[in-house]
Structures are given as C-alpha cells and as structure tokens.
UniProtKB/Swiss-Prot annotation:
Binds 23S rRNA and is also seen to make contacts with the A and possibly P site tRNAs. This is Large ribosomal subunit protein uL16. It comes from Helicobacter pylori (strain J99 / ATCC 700824) (Campylobacter pylori J99). It holds the Pfam family Ribosomal_L16. InterPro entries: Ribosomal_uL16, Ribosomal_uL16_bact-type, Ribosomal_uL16_CS, Ribosomal_uL16_dom, Ribosomal_uL16_sf. The keyword Cell division does not apply.
Length: 141
C-alpha cells in the first residue's frame, strides 16, 4: 500500500482539483504510457490493482513505472456518528489527478502487448485515460 512515511501534519483540507497538469505531463522513462484526460482522485489500492493487472498481462517482461504517488490523506467519520466532535480519522491516501498527467509508463514491451496491458489497467482507474506513445504525446488531450 503506497503512503508517505511521515508528514508534517496528519490531516489536510480537501482543496480543489482545477486546471491542467503542468508537471508529470510528458513521458520521461518509457515509450508508451497512460495519460489522464479528466480530473479525478486515485487512491493507493487503485494504483496497485492497475499495476498488478498490467504486470500479469505482460508476464513480468519489460519495465513499468508508476508516475503517481498518493500523498494526500482522506479522512472519514465512522458510520452512524453524529456531526461534530472534530474531523474524522485518516481513511486512505489519495492523489488528485489533473488532465494531462502521466499515470503509468512502460518500456521494452512489444507495442501490441503493451496496449493490451494498458487497456486492462485503464479499466481499474476511476477517471478517463488514453494511451499515448512518444510520437503521439504532443497531441491535445
């Protein structure tokens, strides 16, 4: 499960997820990748389930990079609890995703097999994504 080792503060405010990704929006390590095309929030379990689906399909060949890390705590109060009495405890760790953000990258895998593996992992993600290559990366999302 991905989460920070330690943080300065235990809980954060919700914040707003607006605009396009200015960082992490280009392929840096691999030659084919998944790029987000809408706003969303991804938690550590979704990151891991998409990674497992991808690596099982490619049978451990090549290399996969996870370009996102959940560093924002999401709190929740227990069920059937009255309002008040402070903010709830940390339930899970998430990351806000903006359009244009690269989520996963692959290298050293035949393009057809890589596209199939990335398509499997796309279904595990809670926002719309598209598969991009180094050549098609500069297209408008």
């Amino acid at each position: 499960m991905l989460m920070p080792k330690r943080t300065k503060y235990r809980k954060q405010m919700k914040g707003r997820n607006r605009g396009k990704a200015h960082r992490g929006n280009s392929i840096a390590f691999g030659d084919i990748a998944i790029k987000a095309i809408e706003h969303g929030r991804i938690d550590s379990r979704q990151i891991e389930s998409a990674r497992v689906a991808m690596t099982r399909h490619i049978k451990r060949a090549g290399k996969v990079w996870i370009r996102v890390f959940p560093d924002k705590p999401l709190t929740a109060k227990p069920l059937e609890t009255r309002m008040g009495k402070g903010k709830g405890s940390v339930e899970k760790w998430v990351m806000n995703i903006k359009p244009g953000r690269i989520v996963y990258e692959m290298l050293g895998i035949e393009e057809g097999l890589a596209r199939e593996a990335l398509a499997l992992s796309q279904s595990k993600l809670p926002f719309k994504t598209k598969i991009v290559t180094c050549e098609s990366e500069n297209e408008i999302y």
